[in-house]
Structures are given as structure tokens and as C-alpha cells.
Amino acid sequence: MTQFASPVLHTLLDTDAYKLHMQQAVFHHYYDVQVAAEFRCRGDDLLGIYADSIREQVDAMQHLALQDDEYQWLSGLPFFKADYLDWLRDFRFNPEQVTITNDNGKLNIRLAGPWREVIMWEVPLLAVISEIVHRYRSPEMGVEHALATLESKLGEFAQMTESVDMSRFRLMDFGTRRRFSREVQQAIVKRLQQEPWFVGTSNYDLARRRNLTPMGTQAHEWFQAHQQISPDLATSQRAALAAWLEEYPDQLGIALTDCITMDAFLRDFGPEFAQRYQGLRHDSGDPVEWGEKAIAHYKKLGIDPLTKVLVFSDNLDLSKALELYRHFSARVNLSFGIGTRLTCDIPQVKPLNIVIKLVECNGKPVAKLSDSPGKTICHDKAFVRALRKAFDLPQIKKAS
């Protein structure tokens, strides 16, 4: 390996919590389901030149395995069953599931294989891409620059919150996927642990080593896959919500609302789901409008919003989180997940706007429509039309 290509990843647990939570549900319910996922760069970065370095990292990932102390720690958490953890012990990344090409400067990546295995690629692979790119672009930058920026922002935040009751403010690190580096994320989390309102991280490795609560439930792919798993497209979102409760009847009960749109989600989120799920997560669209809709929905169902949690995780920074806290904190419980603005907030460093999203399940198309234009992902325009029709949405947005 070149000096720039020392391994980015050192443990299987250097991933987001929702990946393991979803993987266990897939292991128990959808063991044989096949999927395909694709990489997207939402910015104008030409990342194809890094294809060989990324390939090198992907090939090295086959050597990652769950260690005994990690297995013991996971066994002590309330989420996991023994059969899944025993299987996870034997899990190895299969680099043959990953196709990486440089298409005239554009980076193309496609993942394909059993869902129970492919599900594990997204977060560490995005972290690899982000770190490799930053190693080449900003080799002189690192932990001290990230911490200096954070200290400055925490100072401003302390001034902004002097006269605010912060007792109900909860903030989590959601920064694994687009971090500057593993070391930067670790340093940021360590510093944030000094703040009374910092409650956890989405990163399982950091949660274990820093004695933090691992945070995360499910992602868009859980709902997307059900578009083909469920026999009826119109009820696929309800099927996804029900299957999640089968796996986790009394915990991990935060539901992601924007795979189709918030309005379509709320039509499916009836009294039983609303009672049983602990809350909802916002990931696209106007956050204030979304929060007001959520609170109104709970009230309409006769549920006190103060018994529920709204999690905001879309493009947040500290000041945006504070704005939302001031707006909503008297009416509902709140948590804020901040990613890129914590773990890749360094002067002169441009964070990457990169994602990996499901595009097929069992050989058929799936889609994410979302509440933000430009976040729609699907190759098959006819399927997008069918999805919009099934969920009673106007035929306006084009698939990208």
C-alpha cells in the first residue's frame, strides 16, 4: 500500500448503529433477499481518480472480523439475539460484491449480493471514500484543525444558549459516513463528551470504546426493499413498519419518515404504529413544517407529543439545532443528530456530499422519493410513477 493507502478501517464495528440493527432484522426476516445499491456524488466532484485507492481499501476490508471483546460487548446490549451475533462473528466482507470504475473522471460504484451482507458496505465504504479523498486533497489538515473549529463553535454556542433552558437538549454524533478521518471523529466525540447535552454516537466502535450509547434505528433501505418484498406496493411502507416492530417490539422505535414523503408516511402511521413507535426522524424537507405535521398528527390521534421524540438529522449544525430546539422544546421531546458539520468541519476542506442507496431488490427497482427535490433516487421512471400513484402523490418530480 502507498503512504496514502494505509487502512482506513480497523474494526468491523466502525460503522453506524442502524446498519447492525437492520442487518439483524434482515438476517431474521429476509435471509435470502438479493439487492443492488449504487454510489452517488451529489456534488460536482470528479472522484474517479481515486478509484484504485478505494479498490485497495475495499480489498483490505475482507480481513475485518468481529473480535472476542467486541462480541462480548454486543452481547451485553439489549438489541441483539445470540443467533445473529454468532453469525456476525463469521461475517466477512466480500470484495467481489463491489464494482468500482472510473468513468471519465466520475466515480461509479455498484454493490450487489444478499441483502444480509451488502447492507454492511454503505457506511464504511463512504467513510473510506471520504478519508481517501481528504488524504490526497488536504494532507496537512487533521485533528488539531477540527478541534480548533469545534472549540470556536462551542464557544459561540455557549453564548447563544446562556439564557436558554438547555435541560431538554440532546445531541448525537452522526458523522461516520462523511468524516474527514477516523481520528478526527474520535477526537470530536471525545471533546463533545465534556458537554452535558451530548448523549451518544451512531458509531458502534466509538460507542464501545468511549462508553457511549449507540444511536440509530433504520434507514431508507429498510422501506425501499419492502417496495418489492411486500406483495402490494401501496401497503409496503406499513409492511416495513410492522416488520420492524416484529424484530424490535419494545426498543429502537424511531421511524424514518421520508422514504416516500412525510404526508404519505403519516397516512400509513395510524394509531397502533403511533403508540408503539417512540418517535420519528426527519431527514429531508423543511424541518419546522415537518415537526409541526408530526405534532399535529400525534394530537389528532389523541397522543400527547410530550410522550414522543422527534429526531432531526438533516444537514444540521449547532445553531440550526438550537433554532429547532427553541421552536419545539416545550411541546415534544427532541434529539439532534449532526454529522458532517461535526466530523468534517475544517477550514479550507470541502466535505463530500456522497451517498450509497438501494436501487434494486430481488432484481426489481426500488425508489426513494424524499421530501427534498434532488434526493429522489431511481433508474426506472415507470416505477417512480407507479410508486407515486400507489401513495397518491402528484406526478411531478423526475427520477434522477
Curated annotation (Swiss-Prot):
Catalyzes the synthesis of beta-nicotinate D-ribonucleotide from nicotinate and 5-phospho-D-ribose 1-phosphate at the expense of ATP. The lineage of its organism: Bacteria, Pseudomonadati, Pseudomonadota, Gammaproteobacteria, Enterobacterales. This is Nicotinate phosphoribosyltransferase. Keywords: Ligase, Phosphoprotein, Pyridine nucleotide biosynthesis. SUPFAM superfamilies: Nicotinate/Quinolinate PRTase C-terminal domain-like (SSF51690), Nicotinate/Quinolinate PRTase N-terminal domain-like (SSF54675). One of its GO terms (molecular function) is nicotinate phosphoribosyltransferase activity. Coiled coil: none annotated. Signal peptide: none annotated. HAMAP family: NAPRTase. GO terms for cellular component: cytosol. The gene is pncB. Pathway: Cofactor biosynthesis; NAD(+) biosynthesis; nicotinate D-ribonucleotide from nicotinate: step 1/1. NCBIfam families: NAPRTase, PRK05321.1. Its EC number is 6.3.4.21. Transiently phosphorylated on a His residue during the reaction cycle. Phosphorylation strongly increases the affinity for substrates and increases the rate of nicotinate D-ribonucleotide production. Dephosphorylation regenerates the low-affinity form of the enzyme, leading to product release. Belongs to the NAPRTase family. The modification Phosphohistidine is found at residue 220. It catalyses: nicotinate + 5-phospho-alpha-D-ribose 1-diphosphate + ATP + H2O = nicotinate beta-D-ribonucleotide + ADP + phosphate + diphosphate. Pfam families: NAPRTase, NAPRTase_N. PANTHER family: NICOTINATE PHOSPHORIBOSYLTRANSFERASE. One of its GO terms (biological process) is NAD biosynthetic process via the salvage pathway.
